[in-house]
């Protein structure tokens, strides 16, 4: 069967659920798809909870590890939705997921209020540059009707304080309360389906249409690579900037020597595209490229537009112990992992002259030398990680070599 073309008539946004484990992120994602399928119809399809929580090794532990992509639309917009992992061990995936958001829906349980991972995810959203956050206070059905208003008001105040603390506009952020479970059951009371529609309205109105960087040269970080029998190798990822047309030449840059190839096909949500633009999650079919020739962490880019580098100057913020960072300072020649776009690369830190050590909570200018080159430009953001947790975040301020 021929694949249908992807419809671009509505503005497209990438959103995702963030928040503490078991506060209801995946249930909310299911409730959004189900409620919109009923209320608006159109292309909306109800997606069940266990379809979203679908990677097999995760279900055993009842926690979402991978990021799952869903799509839905309101009357005004088309949304691609990532359900982000909530568990602390999987912050790495959160970094790959959250980096892809134009907005995040922070889910907070009405019975618990903000918890450690609520803070961690707001901080991460700030670090990886999620521009807008809106809030859904979930599990309102667990509160006695006579206590509900008072309890929710307390949780709301806590959440607004937290958002302000991490430089989001806590005072003006839309906060909607309800019950994702009730909405999934088709409940029409104010905490059921109507709460979900109210949340969607907040998403439509509070978050402006993102300004896409379509005029910059094409660049797509590679997230995954697989081969399709008889067709060739497909690289998937989110287009970071620019436009890609079928039959465009691209370079594969970073980690290994740079190579060139031609894109012979582009797909998004299993539909064929003539061209992809910034913000699209796509698969690009690459002519004559073997699966072994390309890996996660490389980028596809317009030839000549970006080069791989190992050594750069960076401005770095080192997390405090309370933010989940190191408990002790680090010294010259510290060797953590640097998380660029979709992968970790080990690098050596050189401290500025006269600086003996860097304390948690410090801002510092570092020179970093990576063990393999990464496609980079000034302004590229990264996380610094050690033993599976984020201990700092930074930005490339100058390329040295």
Curated annotation (Swiss-Prot):
HAMAP family reported in the protein's UniProt record: EF_Tu_B
Gene3D superfamilies: P-loop containing nucleotide triphosphate hydrolases, Translation factors
Taxonomy of the source species: Bacteria, Pseudomonadati, Spirochaetota, Spirochaetia, Leptospirales
Region of interest called G4, as start-end residue ranges on this chain: 138-141
GO-annotated cellular components: cytosol
Keywords: Cytoplasm, Elongation factor, GTP-binding, Hydrolase, Magnesium, Metal-binding, Nucleotide-binding, Protein biosynthesis
Binding site for GTP: 19-26, 83-87, 138-141
Name of the protein in its database record: Elongation factor Tu
Residue ranges, annotated region (G3): 83-86
Gene: tuf
């Amino acid at each position: 069967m021929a694949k249908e073309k992807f419809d671009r008539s509505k503005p497209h946004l990438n959103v995702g659920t963030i928040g503490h484990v078991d506060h209801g992120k995946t249930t909310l994602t299911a409730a959004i798809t189900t409620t919109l399928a009923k209320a608006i119809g159109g292309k909306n399809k109800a997606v069940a909870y266990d379809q979203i929580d679908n990677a097999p090794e995760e279900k055993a532990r009842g926690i979402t590890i991978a990021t799952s992509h869903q799509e839905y639309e309101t009357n005004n917009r088309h949304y691609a939705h990532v359900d982000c992992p909530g568990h602390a061990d999987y912050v790495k995936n959160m970094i790959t997921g959250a980096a892809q958001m134009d907005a995040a829906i922070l889910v907070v349980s009405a019975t618990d209020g903000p918890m450690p991972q609520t803070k961690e995810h707001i901080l991460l959203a700030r670090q990886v540059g999620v521009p807008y956050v809106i809030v859904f206070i979930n599990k309102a059905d667990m509160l006695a009707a006579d206590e509900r208003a008072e309890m929710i008001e307390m949780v709301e105040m806590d959440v607004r304080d937290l958002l302000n603390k991490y430089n989001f506009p806590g005072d003006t952020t839309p906060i909607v309360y309800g019950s994702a479970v009730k909405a999934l059951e088709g409940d029409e009371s104010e905490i059921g389906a109507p709460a979900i529609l109210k949340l969607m309205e907040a998403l439509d109105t509070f978050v402006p249409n993102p300004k896409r960087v379509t005029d910059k040269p094409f660049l797509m970080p590679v997230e995954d690579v697989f081969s399709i029998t008889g067709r060739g190798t497909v690289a998937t990822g989110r287009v970071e900037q620019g436009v890609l047309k079928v039959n465009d030449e691209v370079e594969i840059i970073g980690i290994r020597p740079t190579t060139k190839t031609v894109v012979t096909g582009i797909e998004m949500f299993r539909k064929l595209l003539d061209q992809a633009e910034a913000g699209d999650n796509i698969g690009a079919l690459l002519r004559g490229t073997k699966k072994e020739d390309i890996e996660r962490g490389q980028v596809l880019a317009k030839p000549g537009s970006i080069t791989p580098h190992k050594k750069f100057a960076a401005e770095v913020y080192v997390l405090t112990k309370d933010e989940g960072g190191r408990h002790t300072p680090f010294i010259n020649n510290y060797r953590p992992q640097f998380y660029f776009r979709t992968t970790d690369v080990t690098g050596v830190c050189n401290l500025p002259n006269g600086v003996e050590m860097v304390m948690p909570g410090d801002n510092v200018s570092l020179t970093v030398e990576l063990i393999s080159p990464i496609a980079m430009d000034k302004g590229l953001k990264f996380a610094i990680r050690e033993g599976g947790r984020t201990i700092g975040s930074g930005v490339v301020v100058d390329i040295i070599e």
